[in-house]
């Protein structure tokens, strides 16, 4: 058996992200080793012109400062599809309509409620921004559903993008670039609540099953499928399950804070997906344990610096 030494990382003044990632690779173990392997794998996925990359996003990544990163990956053609929660779409729209996300330290939740402020960790939102969100969405829904009362979730998100004028919006950029956004849990969000409110006076059919047709077509139109999985939950499972009929993904990078001992999907190592044919035998898989808002920007910057 070949035993490799663990080399100690050398951090120097003025070093760039690519050098930092290489030092992590010299260590090669624990979190540093995983970050290095994830960076190399992501670069290989981007370089592979025959690979479609699906990006799965769960958790508060848009309010957590990653809106621009996701938007740019769509705009430059890196990803072929985005699978996300309704909450991230909600927060993208909140900013598209002129709202914002705020930061502070220290909080009293009862006082925040009295002041019309909602909290996500140490991220804050204002109720007046959601009031604009509500009125804007009702107008957009009226325009869309008057022409298309029967529509899939992906088609609805695409149509919403056509009504936006914020160039930094994930939804608008996906609309312009023709990149589909899938949100299988859309109803479980403020955007979903607005849809329910619209149906109090209007009859529509939001067809979730129809999304599987376009997603399946996308899966089978590419030689290889890769995945960037940030967080877990429904977006992660929807992403992996979409490749089941082709034997699974060929490569994937996962960043999660969850643990595997309870059998949770969110904490499941990617290798487990092989038993379900959601990852190919011999597929290249890397799981990094940690906060995606801290780790993914570093991994992505490292991958892009080597292109």
Swiss-Prot record:
Reactions accelerated catalytically: [eIF5A protein]-L-lysine + spermidine = [eIF5A protein]-deoxyhypusine + propane-1,3-diamine
Pathway: Protein modification; eIF5A hypusination
Disulphide bond pairs: none
Enzyme Commission code(s) on record: 2.5.1.46
GO molecular function: deoxyhypusine synthase activity
Keyword Transferase among UniProt keywords: yes
Cofactor(s) recorded in Swiss-Prot or TrEMBL: NAD(+)
Active site feature: 278 (nucleophile)
Gene3D superfamilies, A to Z: Deoxyhypusine synthase (3.40.910.10)
Keywords from the UniProt entry: Hypusine biosynthesis, NAD, Transferase
Enzyme class (EC, first level): transferase
Record's GO cellular component terms: cytoplasm
Pfam families, alphabetized: DS
HAMAP family found in the cross-reference section: DHS (MF_00153)
Family statement: Belongs to the deoxyhypusine synthase family.
Biological function: Catalyzes the NAD-dependent oxidative cleavage of spermidine and the subsequent transfer of the butylamine moiety of spermidine to the epsilon-amino group of a specific lysine residue of the eIF-5A precursor protein to form the intermediate deoxyhypusine residue.
The name this protein goes by in its record: Probable deoxyhypusine synthase
Biological source species: Methanothermobacter thermautotrophicus (strain ATCC 29096 / DSM 1053 / JCM 10044 / NBRC 100330 / Delta H) (Methanobacterium thermoautotrophicum)
Protein encoded by which gene: dys
């Amino acid at each position: 058996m070949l035993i490799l030494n663990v080399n100690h990382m050398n951090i120097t003044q003025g070093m760039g992200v690519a050098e930092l990632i290489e030092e992590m690779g010299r260590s090669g173990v624990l979190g540093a080793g995983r970050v290095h392997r994830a960076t190399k794998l992501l670069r290989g996925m981007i370089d592979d012109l025959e690979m479609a990359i699906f990006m799965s996003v769960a958790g508060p990544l848009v309010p957590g400062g990653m809106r621009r990163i996701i938007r740019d990956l769509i705009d430059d053609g890196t990803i072929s599809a985005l699978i996300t929660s309704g909450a991230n779409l909600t927060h993208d729209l909140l900013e598209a309509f002129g709202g914002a996300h705020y930061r502070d330290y220290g909080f009293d939740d009862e006082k925040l409620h009295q002041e019309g402020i909602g909290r996500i960790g140490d991220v804050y939102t204002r109720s007046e921004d959601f009031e604009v969100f509500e009125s804007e969405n009702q107008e957009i829904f009226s325009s869309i559903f008057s022409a298309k009362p029967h529509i899939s979730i992906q088609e609805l998100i695409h149509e919403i993008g056509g009504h936006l004028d914020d160039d930094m919006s994930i939804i608008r950029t996906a609309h312009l670039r023709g990149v589909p956004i899938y949100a299988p849990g859309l109803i479980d969000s403020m955007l979903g609540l607005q849809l329910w409110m619209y149906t109090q006076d209007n009859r529509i059919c939001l067809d979730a099953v129809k999304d599987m047709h376009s997603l399946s077509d996308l899966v089978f139109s590419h030689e290889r499928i890769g995945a960037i999985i940030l967080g877990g939950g429904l977006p992660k499972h929807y992403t992996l399950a979409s490749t089941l009929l082709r034997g699974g993904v060929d490569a994937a990078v996962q960043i999660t804070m969850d643990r595997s001992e309870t059998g949770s999907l969110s904490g499941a190592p990617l290798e487990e997906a092989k038993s379900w044919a959601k990852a190919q035998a011999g597929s290249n898989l890397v799981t990094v344990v940690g906060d995606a808002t801290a780790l993914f920007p570093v991994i992505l910057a490292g991958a892009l610096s080597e292109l």
